[in-house]
Amino acid sequence: MDATHVLCGFSKGLLADLDDLLPPASVLVVEDEYVAAQRDVHRRSAQHPCVAGVVHAPVQDERNPAGIVRAVSRPEHVRAVVPSTEYGVVAAAALAGAWGLPGAGPAAAAVLRDKAALRAHADSAGLPQPRWRLAGSAAEVEDFRAALGGRCVLKPVDRQASLGVLLLDAEDDTDTAWKATTTAEEPRMRAPGTSSGRFLVEERLTGPEVSVECLVHRGDLLFTNVTGKQLRPGPYPVEIGHVVPAGLPAPVTGELTRLMRRLVESTGFSSGVLHAEWILVDGTRPHLVECAGRLPGDSIDTLIDLAHGGRIVADLLAVLQEGPPPVRGPARAGAAIRFLTARPGMVRAVSGLTASRESNGVREVELTARQGTVVGELNSSWDRLGHVLATGATGAEAARNAAAAAALVEVRTS
């Protein structure tokens, strides 16, 4: 098959975008064989006209990126390699580098995919961030947190979607937290044997959280967006809402942009999209949480499109295939998403969907739970049940619209 675009990892949402942007049979999906079977990738990919085929390769073997280069033959007319999942970032950079195409760059991709490597890099680059260390046991976590008054953050170095991330207060048991973090798994998303099995313990900072999305072309920031975040209170910091634009004071936005530019320059990140999360200590001083070298999840790309106009996916393709650099302006409206959750138990009834869809500014309402669905604890992004996406004249108005519409949806469990 002679595809023009290669995707490292299966992403239903990205393929839906590419159906609108690319000709039929132009995309090759590269996925790990185990993950492809678990996620029914062949059948699901066949539902997208843009897909030419699916090939199996060690796309998640980040310790041996040369393996993906040996396993995947270069399509004759390939124009771009796209990291379509978090676990495909290193593979995409490796293929793009080997094939002479624009991309993150192998060295930058390796740093972004390892939270410990990113922490070490941020220290050397002078980027503000929490104090941290690698932890190999509950005892090491206990020693670290004791020096900080007992509060800390515990997380895996190479997972996504807040999986295994725990916020500890002084009274929380270290052994229980260590077990929860070290046993957190994504059996359908992560290939066996590919996780490094390493963990971080970090200083727990306080302040609002935001993410910064940057479109980067040959090391230059073409576009920067700041997304406001709402996190669920409690030990599991699951994101339950986003809003674009965040509506921060201009000096804070300027400082975030300056720090993103330093991150790009210091890592050598070349071309693509960055999605970095920051805590604003005292509401004004950004401290780095983490950074991904791919499109943002949680429909943030859709929020950016609705607020700013244009298509961020089309812009990504432009910088990855050396097209004319896209031009974007400031946000012209607001867009927000609110995620739907429920108490653990079996779903007995669902109501309010019609009213929610008819609410002010609502663009989309999705709910996966049905009568009889078993709802578990809300420990990661994978445990959310759906979302409401809304727009408004400003980010604040969009956030109010999304929250009001989400409040109309009731999922009763027992």
Predicted regions and their residues:
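Peripheral (often C-terminal) accessory segments that flank ATP-dependent C-N-forming ligase machineries
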Residues: L317-S414
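ATP-dependent carboxylate/phosphate-activation module, predominantly the ATP-grasp catalytic core
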Residues: S196, E203-F269, V273, L280, ...
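Short beta->alpha connector loops
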Residues: C8-L14, Y87, A135-A139, L205-T206
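Domain-scale detector for complete catalytic domains at protein termini or as standalone homologs
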Residues: A3-P75
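Conserved ATP-binding module of the ATP-grasp superfamily
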Residues: P128-P130, R151-L154, D169-T206, E239-H242, ...
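Conserved N-proximal alpha/beta basic substrate-recognition cap immediately N-terminal to
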Residues: V41, P49-G136, R384
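Short beta-strand-to-turn element immediately C-terminal to the catalytic PLP-Schiff-base lysine
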Residues: A135, V165-A170, L215-H217, V281
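Acidic/histidine-enriched active-site and ligand-binding environments that engage anionic O-linkages
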Residues: R145-L154, F223
